[in-house]
């Protein structure tokens, strides 16, 4: 037995570790207590730096101790010479780097470094950029370090082109670098600003085509990595629509003027307000949303005085101006006409996608074919399938409608965990296509029956629709945005899964509402219909509430103006 190393048993090892932890805890607690006592006594000297170094060196995520260090450093600045202060800062930077090696994702350490560098008269920003490069080489997903690099680049006024080159080097080394792709999406709009475009606006076409080629190389190298696919989707995105008036509608009978915006806005806010001119004379009116709530909305209304609608003149001219962008629309109400409107002739490029040049269309068509080839090799790659769908939407949504639906079916089978999201996205695309077809046909009737819809969107585009058929879908609710349909007279929503009709409110022209075979269980669910003054026909057959005793009398009492209620 002599000369052989004694091996501790597991119990002895556990006991030794316990004693070691207890010893460390005692030291930790005593050092912390000493720091707090000195802080309370106002003893902001270098001994506090030494004590906090012992603790933060092992646990950099003690925010209160970083605050203590800042207080001490600020105090010592007033007592030491410039040379001594510089030495103190140099030592602090070295200590921070050692803390980052303990925990490269320490909030407190990176924040303290920002604070320290901000106080220096001439920081060495080049050294800080090199520090970031080292830590990102160790862990390219360290978003704390990415945040710090953006701070350094901003303080040092590093040109966006240099930072873009830095992302090039990281992406070239490893395509699976979401942070680099994201940083790239922030830098490119700065490098190539476009007129009338926001910070996430579109890129010049030559830049866009180059980026598409780069990202295609990435996802063909590793088809299962999502980073490049997300960046590709950003490239295919479109800029935020400008704040413009899409439509103005005047109803003589309701004595009401309705306007529709390209996106939800608040009238009367810092963004702008609406000015109304009637026969070239300004008219002061109160603007409101269809539901009466003062919040951003696509549609805004105002009541018109009788004088602006009288028949003594052959016509009345209504001009609405949005001060936020000087957008305006004008329509003329002729004598004996019940309504008038003005709306731009919309195309799919204007409504739902960007206009494509011949060159860009050629590139995207080539990408589509390449993705189809990749999908044959990787038939269960969900990112590839989704990108094929998005490319088809970007190229021609109506031409590829049938093929897009087939790819949706394949994608749902491949990615069943996201079936609900895919159903909603499919519904969105189908509704967009239906709106486009309605625009091209120049009609005010929209048929959306038997389309397996799960959600409704773009309802602001339907302000002029008089008949809407939503029957035989999978809708569980009708959204409040339905109030945008100011001209709607007939709504068919039978054979869905509606549990309430909260969205069917404040529709001034609604006359017929068909709700057969839904999931309406109580008469209280019908209460919102009280706000539809012209409703005369309500069909509730096939709903559970029809089994309630005395339901007919209860509904007649609730809706006295509805002459025909079918249960």
From Swiss-Prot:
<dbReference type="GO" id="GO:0008270">
    <property type="term" value="F:zinc ion binding"/>
</dbReference>
<dbReference type="Pfam" id="PF01239">
    <property type="entry name" value="PPTA"/>
</dbReference>
<feature type="repeat" description="PFTA 3">
    <location>
        <begin position="124"/>
        <end position="158"/>
    </location>
</feature>
<feature type="repeat" description="PFTA 6">
    <location>
        <begin position="363"/>
        <end position="397"/>
    </location>
</feature>
<feature type="repeat" description="PFTA 5">
    <location>
        <begin position="207"/>
        <end position="241"/>
    </location>
</feature>
<feature type="repeat" description="LRR 3">
    <location>
        <begin position="487"/>
        <end position="508"/>
    </location>
</feature>
<dbReference type="Pfam" id="PF07711">
    <property type="entry name" value="RabGGT_insert"/>
</dbReference>
<feature type="modified residue" description="Phosphoserine">
    <location>
        <position position="98"/>
    </location>
</feature>
<dbReference type="InterPro" id="IPR009087">
    <property type="entry name" value="RabGGT_asu_insert-domain"/>
</dbReference>
<comment type="similarity">
    <text>Belongs to the protein prenyltransferase subunit alpha family.</text>
</comment>
<protein>
    <recommendedName>
        <fullName>Geranylgeranyl transferase type-2 subunit alpha</fullName>
        <ecNumber>2.5.1.60</ecNumber>
    </recommendedName>
</protein>
<keyword id="KW-0637">Prenyltransferase</keyword>
<dbReference type="InterPro" id="IPR036254">
    <property type="entry name" value="RabGGT_asu_insert-dom_sf"/>
</dbReference>
<comment type="subunit">
    <text>Heterotrimer composed of RABGGTA, RABGGTB and CHM; within this trimer, RABGGTA and RABGGTB form the catalytic component B, while CHM (component A) mediates peptide substrate binding. The Rab GGTase dimer (RGGT) interacts with CHM (component A) prior to Rab protein binding; the association is stabilized by geranylgeranyl pyrophosphate (GGpp). The CHM:RGGT:Rab complex is destabilized by GGpp. Interacts with non-phosphorylated form of RAB8A; phosphorylation of RAB8A at 'Thr-72' disrupts this interaction.</text>
</comment>
<keyword id="KW-0808">Transferase</keyword>
<feature type="repeat" description="LRR 2">
    <location>
        <begin position="464"/>
        <end position="486"/>
    </location>
</feature>
<dbReference type="GO" id="GO:0031267">
    <property type="term" value="F:small GTPase binding"/>
</dbReference>
<feature type="repeat" description="LRR 4">
    <location>
        <begin position="509"/>
        <end position="530"/>
    </location>
</feature>
<keyword id="KW-0677">Repeat</keyword>
<dbReference type="GO" id="GO:0018344">
    <property type="term" value="P:protein geranylgeranylation"/>
</dbReference>
<keyword id="KW-0433">Leucine-rich repeat</keyword>
<dbReference type="GO" id="GO:0004663">
    <property type="term" value="F:Rab geranylgeranyltransferase activity"/>
</dbReference>
<feature type="repeat" description="LRR 5">
    <location>
        <begin position="534"/>
        <end position="555"/>
    </location>
</feature>
<dbReference type="GO" id="GO:0006888">
    <property type="term" value="P:endoplasmic reticulum to Golgi vesicle-mediated transport"/>
</dbReference>
<dbReference type="GO" id="GO:0005968">
    <property type="term" value="C:Rab-protein geranylgeranyltransferase complex"/>
</dbReference>
<dbReference type="InterPro" id="IPR032675">
    <property type="entry name" value="LRR_dom_sf"/>
</dbReference>
<comment type="function">
    <text>Catalyzes the transfer of a geranylgeranyl moiety from geranylgeranyl diphosphate to both cysteines of Rab proteins with the C-terminal sequence -XXCC, -XCXC and -CCXX, such as RAB1A, RAB3A, RAB5A and RAB7A.</text>
</comment>
<feature type="repeat" description="PFTA 2">
    <location>
        <begin position="88"/>
        <end position="122"/>
    </location>
</feature>
<feature type="repeat" description="PFTA 1">
    <location>
        <begin position="44"/>
        <end position="78"/>
    </location>
</feature>
<feature type="repeat" description="LRR 1">
    <location>
        <begin position="442"/>
        <end position="463"/>
    </location>
</feature>
<dbReference type="InterPro" id="IPR002088">
    <property type="entry name" value="Prenyl_trans_a"/>
</dbReference>
<feature type="repeat" description="PFTA 4">
    <location>
        <begin position="159"/>
        <end position="193"/>
    </location>
</feature>
<keyword id="KW-0597">Phosphoprotein</keyword>
<dbReference type="GO" id="GO:0005737">
    <property type="term" value="C:cytoplasm"/>
</dbReference>
